[in-house]
Amino acid sequence: MNKDLLLSSYDYTLANELIANYPTNPKEDARLLVFDRKNKEIFHTTFKNLQDFLPNCAIFFNDTKVIKARIYGNKASGGKIELFLHQPFLNSHDPLFLAQIKGRVKKDEILYFKDDLKVRVVELLNDGLRKVQFFQNDKTLDTSNLYNLLDKIGHIPLPPYIKREDEKSDLKDYQSIFAKNLGAVAAPTASLHFSETMLENLRKKHEIYHLTLHVGAGTFKSVECENIQEHKMHSEFFNIPQQACEIIDSKQAILGVGTTVTRTIEYYARTKTKNGFCDLFLHPQNPPIRQNHLLTNFHLPKSTLIMLVSAFIGREQCLKLYELAIKEKYRFYSYGDAMLIL
């Protein structure tokens, strides 16, 4: 079988000390590895110098906003419970939600949280997932009311590879400066590097567009089948404004900031769907057909995200660049450094 389709072909070894537990401060001082595909050139610089390398292009950002999706509570017996909200079931008659619960629970069990928030376990699903209903003062909470309450009592859901509790600084650090549409349970991390000053400077030379893709917990789901074509990609809600669609439909060069932007642009390029659910899986055998350039962080081995990067530059080239980044001690994952692919 073609090696590009084998999960084991996307593996690499990373020392724990290269996993960033906190962002660089100031954030635009993060490092940036630039790879020019046409000339096969590599540059090592800092993120604040991004504009020095950008060609004439429109820049697309994901303006999703991370929910405080993690809450801690108790069972009636007093046992501790941790609930991680994933997403609402949009097609259900009553407001129901998908959540991951740490701790053994039964169907119809009631769980208790701060501010008189109660959760009823409606259904036990696979992979530790549960269908749940939220109540406060015995009234069912819809998505909007729940998100407002979580903003008071919830915690920022840091990724599983950041081995610490969330802190006050994460409220700002794990949210992009243009985040406005609540619904993500993970940040579109390439966006986290941008400061207001950088954005202002970019606007002077580039057209900026926003789209929304609510990053789901599935972004951390590991690929378990050796033939990656058998992997079932998670589905995430997206919305693209008309003006952004017109740019995608044009011949204008596009820089996508982050893998979520890339998947949304490429889904639209294939389907002409402006609003719905995206489950597009990009890899070297299913490469991009519209987006020209990519700005992204360094991703986990064997993840759909490293496969997406490989779809742009080829698997072997991607692994070579990761090997170089490790040698040069770049910082990896959500709070880590960035890579620009031209």
Swiss-Prot record:
Family: Belongs to the QueA family.
Subunit structure: Monomer.
Name listed for the protein in its UniProt record: S-adenosylmethionine:tRNA ribosyltransferase-isomerase
Species: Campylobacter jejuni (strain RM1221)
Signal peptide start-end: none
Gene designation per UniProt: queA
UniProt cross-references to InterPro entries, sorted A to Z: QueA, QueA_dom1, QueA_dom2, QueA_sf
Gene Ontology MF term list: S-adenosylmethionine:tRNA ribosyltransferase-isomerase activity
Reaction catalysis annotation: 7-aminomethyl-7-carbaguanosine(34) in tRNA + S-adenosyl-L-methionine = epoxyqueuosine(34) in tRNA + adenine + L-methionine + 2 H(+)
HAMAP family found in the cross-reference section: QueA
E.C. designation(s): 2.4.99.17
Keywords: Cytoplasm, Queuosine biosynthesis, S-adenosyl-L-methionine, Transferase
Function: Transfers and isomerizes the ribose moiety from AdoMet to the 7-aminomethyl group of 7-deazaguanine (preQ1-tRNA) to give epoxyqueuosine (oQ-tRNA).
Lineage top rank: taxon: Bacteria
Annotated localization: Cytoplasm
GO cellular component labels: cytoplasm
Involved pathway(s): tRNA modification; tRNA-queuosine biosynthesis
Listed GO biological process terms: queuosine biosynthetic process; tRNA wobble guanine modification
